[in-house]
Amino acid sequence: MRLGVLDVGSNTVHLLVVDAYRGGHPTPMSSTKATLRMVEATDSSGKITKRAADKLVSTIGEFAKIAVSSGCAELMAFATSAVREAGNSDDVLSRVRKETGVRLQVLRGVDESRLTFLAVRRWFGWSAGRIINLDIGGGSLELSNGVDEEPEVALSLPLGAGRLTREWLPDDPPGRRRVAMLRDWLDSELSDASVTVLEAGKPDLAVATSKTFRSLARLTGAAPSAAGPRAKRALTVNGLRQLIAFISRMTASDRAELEGISTERAPQIVAGALVAEASMRALSIETVDICPWALREGLILRKLDSEADGTALVQTSVRDTRGQEVDRNAANRSRGDKT
């Protein structure tokens, strides 16, 4: 089956076309991206601007045509935190559907976390044992822990690299004092979340997904993307600390000259590095293995599974009083309760 996955993220809109069937390795056929920076496209009231909405609609329409011309039997389109948190998200979604015919599904943060965990589990396999996964997006940080394909704990926190750059590091380069303040604040924000994640059990393997982690690993010496997805890549907390000391003194334009970081992500890589470091510190992780699969692959795998066994593509989650999304019962559902 040829599938198209359209991902409206905080930084980019990405269309991935794959050939996939249940039990098989999804084979990428094409990849098309557009940088829209939706995480920065809101006005003072928290609504997506008309200009940004216009660009989003035209991009989705263009990508939908690419999916059709590529022979996709189905286009799965989803959006994450930038659209999810916008005050006018319903209006934007309605406009996308009306003008392009694409039904854009907004994923909850914990669904992002759970679907990404599924992709990680399939990539590393059962022999990896208990896995903790970390994923840094433009608007949120996802954490998960489990021994099955459904994590026992899945969290989504509003600690994305783009969000924190805007709120904490507006200067270029960021001042040393602001970096130190953000570091301390992250330690406080992650204290309760780390306890929740670790209550499920100590990991046998710590994994990281997302472009932010891949860029950080490359900046600390990991293999380039040209080496292929199966090249082993890792990121250490010591290497991360040294990297932060280096890149936090550079301007965004200078950081963009470094191998492994794009012009689009250069402004927010310092905040991303600080989130990565704080997360690893909070979870007592020294090294994370980088997984090339993440949310898009997880959605493809869940789609194939749901068609075979009749389960829902995504399930409901709860939001706690601190604004973080948390799911502590996913593994129990996967073991028998599929309602």
Swiss-Prot record:
Record's compositionally biased regions (Basic and acidic residues): 319-339
SUPFAM superfamilies: Actin-like ATPase domain (SSF53067)
Alphabetic keyword roster: Hydrolase
EC number from the UniProt entry: 3.6.1.11
Gene Ontology MF terms: exopolyphosphatase activity
Annotated InterPro entries: ATPase_NBD (IPR043129), GppA/Ppx_hydrolase (IPR050273), Ppx_GppA_N (IPR003695)
Pfam family, one: Ppx-GppA
Protein family (similarity comment): Belongs to the GppA/Ppx family.
Subunit details: Homodimer.
Record's function text: Degradation of inorganic polyphosphates (polyP). Releases orthophosphate processively from the ends of the polyP chain.
Protein's UniProt name: Exopolyphosphatase 1
Organism: Mycobacterium leprae (strain TN)
